[in-house]
Amino acid sequence: MITIIGPTASGKTSFAAALSARIGAEIISADSRQVYRRMDIGTGKDLDDYVVNDKKIPYHLIDIAEPGTQYNLFQYQQDFHTVYDKLQSGNRPIVLCGGTGLYVEAVLKGYALSPVPQDPVLRESLEGKSLSELEKILVELKTRNHSVMHNKTDVDTTNRAIRAIEIETYQLSHPVGERQMPKVNSLIIGLDINRDERRRKITQRLKDRLANGMVEEVKSLLDSGIPAENLIYYGLEYKFVTQYIIGELSFDEMFAALEIAIHQFAKRQMTWFRGMERRGFQIHWLNTSLPMDEKIKFAESLLGNDNIIN
């Protein structure tokens, strides 16, 4: 398997699709928000990128959950292995592509996870606490658990932080069992984008998404009966656009806050990927500004050296 990672706006999908077209691979997404149906513009699905030379590249784990629900890491790990095992049995090359570092690391390392029920008493005790207060509690729990899960990338709202605390608290009294998920051997390619170029692309992409109907997309989700707090839970575009629609922010306030949040998110993504290197992953960094054919040649040279496709 080949894994392609990188921060938002680094061109992961187009590179993964072009590489998959060259080697006959199918793509498994590793994006914690693209799993949701009808959340297309805000999550940046860019499904047109999966068409290369008029050929549609098969992709998986996109549009598999209903908006308003809370898809989680445990579910992703199960769904990943269902698809992975099927593709392997058919001897299909696989490209794992996404910016959710926790999802990528969990499937490559084979983290032993279990479904964690909600704890109403704990949730009530955490109500009213600020995000910074919740983060301090989470850091302490992670230290006690020796946990690498729940990076700031994944807890950018109070609801997410409370859920992370709930999981870490559960793990303290329910140690992970002996059975591990199988580790997955993979060549990892990281897309490295210049900071200034990344910031420019993020800002332009945000303008494009707003011009192409992102506000209308969020309105339609609200009109379908999804509570505002459920959309705010998803963070970033869905958080700030929802706050704009319900009157908590002006358009200019929404744009400014969202732009800052996405820049911070991209920075945290890179922090996670650098942390993966410290935790023993070898990542082959590729300059995203290179022409696509040079990127493909880079990947093929690595495949020629390591021959890690399945």
Language model: regions and residue ranges:
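Phosphate/pyrophosphate-binding catalytic cores of soluble transferases and nucleic-acid-acting enzymes
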Residues: M1-N310
